[in-house]
Design a protein with these regions (language model features):
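Glycine-rich phosphate-binding active-site loops on the catalytic face of alpha/beta enzymes
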Residues: 24-37, 85-102, 146-161, 187, ...
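Catalytic cores of alpha/beta
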Residues: 10-21, 60, 67-85, 129-146, ...
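A short, flexible beta-alpha/helix-coil linker loop
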Residues: 32-33, 65-67
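Active-site-adjacent beta->alpha loops and helix N-cap segments on the catalytic face
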Residues: 12-16, 32-57, 73-76, 99-118, ...
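N-terminal entry module detector
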Residues: 1-32
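Hydrophobic faces of well-ordered beta-strands that scaffold small-molecule active sites
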Residues: 3-7, 26-28, 56-62, 94-96, ...
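Active-site pocket-lining/capping segments in soluble small-molecule metabolic enzymes
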Residues: 45, 101-104, 109-112, 123, ...
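Helix C-cap/helix->beta junction micro-motif
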Residues: 54, 89, 117-120, 146, ...
């Protein structure tokens, strides 16, 4: 099975470059220095048109700010509105995540956001990596039960090399048991084939996934 290379971009020139260099799917962000936040409506619209013209798929990041993933009611309203707008513009999918002050999945918030995203694929983004191990396993089950398609994870702190997180990623994959996709993040063009083979996954994600 061919490996799906999901490239993270935040500018239109980068979008064009990664499509030309073999990206299969796009995750569109703004402000990667902040870890990626929701792009502008204009950027989303132009990116969707370009990606679809090239017969690829696009997921849009829904995140109102950098920092943690604990959101107040107003921020959650913003996220819901951004999801609905992204849906109207024709995106294939959205990526989001919300946690509680106790560092657990904010299930109430996630239910509302998932409902708003009807008709699009949903990715739980790297907020997942902020959870402890037991909560990650519970979250995999909860997301599976609520129709989320995949979970983006580095398997540990983003500063750690992916090789150091292989065993943890294998545990997550075993627990997911193919009921939900585990999308390894922080992967590069230099290591994606090795990582995909080691983990037996068919999709990988990163800002440097294509040259």
């Amino acid at each position: 099975m061919a490996i799906i290379k999901e490239a993270v971009v935040a500018t239109f020139p980068d979008l064009v470059r990664v499509i030309q260099n073999g990206a299969d799917r796009i995750e569109l962000n703004a402000d990667l220095a902040a870890g990626g936040i929701t792009p502008s409506k204009g950027m989303i619209a132009e990116a969707i048109q370009y990606v679809h013209d090239h017969d690829k798929e696009i997921t849009v990041m829904i995140r109102p700010r950098g920092g943690n993933f604990v959101y107040n009611d107003i921020e959650l309203k913003i996220m819901e509105a951004d999801i609905l707008e992204t849906q109207q513009l024709g995106a294939d999918g959205v990526a989001f995540g919300a946690l509680t002050d106790e560092n657990t999945l904010d299930e109430d918030a996630m239910e509302n956001l998932i409902a708003a995203a009807g008709g699009m694929t949903i990715t739980m983004h790297m907020a997942f990596d902020a959870l402890d191990h037991e909560e990650q396993l519970h979250t995999i089950d909860w997301l599976t039960d609520h129709g989320v398609e995949r979970i983006l994870t580095h398997g540990g702190d983003l500063a750690t090399p992916i090789d150091a997180n292989i065993n943890h990623l294998k545990e997550l994959l075993a627990h997911a048991a193919n009921h939900i996709g585990i999308l390894p993040g922080g992967i590069t063009s230099a290591n994606y084939e090795t990582i995909a083979k080691t983990l037996t996954v068919y999709q990988v994600h990163g800002t440097k996934i294509v040259d």
